[in-house]
Every structure is written in C-alpha cells, then in structure tokens.
UniProtKB/Swiss-Prot annotation:
Annotated stretches, region: Hyaluronic acid-binding: 420-430, 442-451
Species of provenance: Rattus norvegicus
Glycosylation sites recorded in the entry for this protein: N262, N302, N483
Molecular function GO labels: cargo receptor activity; hyaluronic acid binding
Keywords tagged on the record: Cytoplasm, Cytoskeleton, Glycoprotein, Hyaluronic acid, Phosphoprotein, Repeat
GO CC field: cell surface; cytoplasm; spindle
Compartment(s) where it occurs, according to its Swiss-Prot or TrEMBL record: Cell surface; Cytoplasm; Cytoplasm, Cytoskeleton, Spindle
Subunit structure: Interacts with ANKRD26. Interacts with DYNLL1. Interacts with FAM83D/CHICA.
Name of the featured protein: Hyaluronan-mediated motility receptor
Modification Phosphothreonine occurs at: T488
Biological processes, Gene Ontology terms: cell-cell signaling; cytoskeleton organization; hyaluronan catabolic process; receptor-mediated endocytosis
Required for interaction with FAM83D as annotated region, ranges: 150-331
Purpose of the protein: Receptor for hyaluronic acid (HA). Involved in cell motility. When hyaluronan binds to HMMR, the phosphorylation of a number of proteins, including the PTK2/FAK1 occurs. May also be involved in cellular transformation and metastasis formation, and in regulating extracellular-regulated kinase (ERK) activity. May act as a regulator of adipogenisis.
Amino acid sequence: MGGGVSYVGWLEKSETEKLLEYIEEISCASDQVEKYKLDIAQLEEDLKEKDREILCLKQSLEEKVSFSKQIEDLTVKCQLLEAERDDLVSKDRERAESLSAEMQVLTEKLLLERQEYEKLQQNELQSQSLLQQEKELSAHLQQQLCSFQEEMTSERNVFKEQLKLALDELDAVQQKEEQSEKLVKQLEEETKSTAEQLRRLDDLLREKEIELEKRTAAHAQATVIAQEKYSDTAQTLRDVTAQLESYKSSTLKEIEDLKLENLTLQEKVAMAEKRVEDVQQQILTAESTNQEYAKVVQDLQNSSTLKEAEIKEITSSYLEKITDLQNQLRQQNEDFRKQLEEEGAKMTEKETAVTELTMEINKWRLLYEELYDKTKPFQQQLDAFEAEKQALLNEHGATQEQLSKIRDSYAQLLGHQNLKQKIKHVVKLKDENSQLKSEVSKLRSQLAKRKQNELRLQGELDKALGIRHFDPPKAFCHESKENVTLKTPLKEGNPNCC
C-alpha cells in the first residue's frame, strides 16, 4: 500500500512536473516571440537612430555650408568696406582736388582782379597826371594869356601915353600956334613999332613954322606910324584877342571836355574805387572763403586722415579678422573636409550599413510580415495557449490544493477505512488515473503538435533571423521521463502487500 501511494505520488509529481515543463515551454515560446518582437522593435529604433544621425549629419553639413556662406558674406562685406573706403578716399581726394582747383581759380581770379585794380590805379594815376598836365597847361596858358594881356595892356598904356604925349605935344603946338598967332598979332602990333623985330620975328616965325611943319610932319608921320602901329597893334590885339577868344573857347571847351572827362574819370575812379572796394570785399570774401575752404580742406584732410587711419585700422583689423577667419575657415574647411571625409566614409559605411540594414530590415520586415502572416493564425492559439497556461497555472494551484486536500483525505481514508473501502478507493483512483492519463495523452498530443508548430515557427524565425539557438527537441528531450515508453505496462499493486 505504501508502494502504491508512493507510486501515485510519483505519478502526480511527474504529471505536475510535465505540466510545469509544458507551461514553462509555452512561457519560453511566448518570451521568445516577445524577444523577437523586442529585437524587431530594437532594429526599428536603431534604424530611426541611424536616420536621426543622418539628419544630424545633414544639419551639421548645412550649418557648415551656412557658416561658409557667412564667411563668404563677411568677405564680401569686407570687400564692400574696402570699396567704400576707396570711394571715400577717392571722393576726399577729388573734393580736395576740386577745392584746390577752386582755390587756384580764386587765386588766379584774385590775381587778375589785383592786376585789373593795379591797371585801374595806373589809369587813374595816368588820368590824374594828364589832368594835372592839363591843369598845368591851362594854368600856363592862363598865365601866358594874363602876361600877354598885361603886355597888351602895358603896350596899350604905352601907346596911350605916347598918343597922349603926342596929343599933348599937338596941344602944346596948337597952344604955341595960338601963342604964335598972339605973338604974330603982337608982332603985327609991334611990327608997326619995329620992322626989324618983325622981320626977325617973321624969319623966326618962318623958321618956327618950318620947324613946326617939320615937327608937325614928324608928329603927323609919328602919329600916322603910331596910328598904323596902333591899328596893327589893335589888329594884332584883335587877332590875338580872337585867337585868345578862340583859344579860350577851345581851351574852355577843352576844359569842359577835360572837366567832363575828369568827371567821367572821377566817375570811373569812383566806379573803379567801388569796384576796387568790391574787389577788396570779394578779396576779403575770397580770403575768408579761402580760409573757410582751407579750414574745410584742413578739416577734410584731418577727417580724411582720421578716416584713413580709422579705415586703415578697420581694414587692418578686418584683414586680421579676415586672415584669422580665413585661417579658421581653412582650418575648419580642413577639419570639415577631414570630417566630411570621415563623415563621408562613415556616411558611406553608414549608408552601406543603412542600405544593408534597410535591406535587412526590409528582409526582416518581409520575413516579419511573412512570419506575422504565418503566425497570425497561431496568434489566437498562442493567446489561447497563454490563457490556457494561466488557466493551467490556476488549475495547477487548484489541483495542488485539491491534491493536498485529497492527500489529507486519502491519508484519513487510509487511516480510518477498511480494506474493501481502500480497494474501492484505489480502483476509483486507478479509474481517475487512467482518465487523467488519457487526458494527459491528449494534452501531450496537443502539446506535441504545438511544440512542432512552435519549433517550425522558431526554425523559420531563426532561419529568417540567421540565429542559431539551442535545439529545442534536444533541450526538451528527457529520456528518463516522458520520452521513454515503459517496456511493461503498469501492473496493479498487490492489495495484500500492506
């Protein structure tokens, strides 16, 4: 009886172990499928990671290209600044040249104005000298006229004196004639007295008359000569007076002309003085303008110098920056080229790997799809297996409880029942055992079919994945347990052995 109990316990333990092994196999198959799913998900994550790395490399390449463009833009900007610097320098140079040209023109204009002013001053001096000469000539002519008038007046006075003397002499002669007549009368009166005295007086009278005639003739001739001379002198005086009048009129006309010319010259002088003042004002304005221009030119030169220094400094700094940037750009281009080469090699490798991975992923995807299509009909079975496993686990727990209860009750029965009852109970247990064996054989056949399906699916999956795992039939081959059929069937135990 003890051997039967131990055999039943061993059988229950064997069945329980087989059931647990079956559950473990189902769990391993489910875990393997989950592992395959996780591997495929990991492969997809790796593919996404590779895509992200490719995208990062593309972004890095775009950043390097944009940085290269920025360097090119900075180079173009520096060239524009240099061109602007050159334009500013050329503009300042042109402005300085134009200002110097304007200053040269203004200087030449100022020289021309000064020359014209000097010519005007010379003309004014010449006009003043001509006017002075004309004044001196007029004064000389006036003096000559006055001296000539004085000479004429003195000659007229002399002639008048001579004529007066002649007239006085003529009056004296007439008076003498009257006296002579009186004397003749007296002589005639005295003739009577004395004949000698009369004759003497007559002779004397005759002599006196002859002398008087001579003197009268001389006086008459002198008077005629004086009259002729007076007439000539008067004619000459008239001619001279006419000439003087003509000369005076011409001189007056010339004086008027000279006055007009003088007025004109004075006006010209005034205009020239005004023009000189204007020129002086223009000169002052030009000098102030020149000073302003010189100041502006100086400021421009200073600003140009400052700008040139600033531009040189900026240019040198920009050139240094450009040199540094070019060196950095060269270094970065070299690094970038090396990195590009490395990245290109990596990209080539990655592209090759990605291509291989893509091909492999496509292959795995196709295999997965095929596997999924193939395992899709079995998914429900796997789910059913999982549910059945859970149910079996639950049933195992319940069976364990029932077994413990049955063991307890069986121990109680064996301890409290008689032999007949024990035999009946053993027969009942045998029937239940045979029934359980038939159920176990059914479950084994189902489990074998499932194992075959799982092994086939696992083989296809391993073949698709190229994975070599342990051989499940060999791993699950337990020669000492379920894989060995009993050579002799179980016999009924001897009920009398107890």
